[in-house]
A protein has these predicted regions:
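The substrate-binding groove and active-site-proximal loops of carbohydrate-active enzymes
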Residues: 3-14, 35-53, 99-118, 125, ...
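Structural preference for beta-strand elements that scaffold enzyme active sites
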Residues: 2-4, 31, 67-69, 133-138
């Protein structure tokens, strides 16, 4: 049986990653999902990609034989994007906008959000698409969670 876990290396000091990977492998974990909420770490400013931490996380996990399910970070647009495109935030039925800060803080009908999703996903695919440890991709996360499907 193959068993997977979610892991958020961006939330932990790098000094913990190797020990976490060792424990996962020791417990029989085979797959680790990472990345789905890390857009602000991958692209802290528009068009400025920072991959070193993700490169290191993938290599650290792969060194223990763990396979990677790489999540696109589209479930958590970064602050700079929301500031640049305020109507990217979802609106309630009464027209008031959500605040920035929770996951899924975007309107699925937003063309700007979709265009930026294509851009970050293509950048990730170029960098990690042929990586031998990346065995699957997760596109977005929890569609419909937090009542995010209605678009007003």
């Amino acid at each position: 049986m193959q068993i997977g876990v979610c892991y958020y290396p961006e939330q932990w000091p790098r000094t913990m990653w190797a020990e976490d990977a060792r424990r996962m492998a020791e417990l029989g974990i085979t797959h680790v999902r990472i990345g789905e909420f890390a857009w602000s770490r991958m692209e802290p400013r528009a068009g400025v990609y920072v991959w070193d931490w993700l490169d290191d996380a993938i290599e650290t996990l792969a060194a223990r034989g763990l396979k990677i399910v790489l999540g696109t970070p589209t479930a958590a647009p970064p602050r700079w994007l929301v500031d640049a495109v305020p109507d990217l935030l979802p609106a309630r039925a009464d027209g008031t906008r959500w605040n920035y800060g929770s996951r899924r803080h975007y309107d699925i009908a937003s063309e700007a959000w979709r265009a930026h999703c294509v851009r970050i996903t293509e950048a990730m695919a170029q960098r990690y698409g042929a990586h031998p440890a990346v065995v699957a991709w997760q596109t977005d996360n929890e569609l419909g969670c937090h009542d995010t499907v209605p678009s007003w």
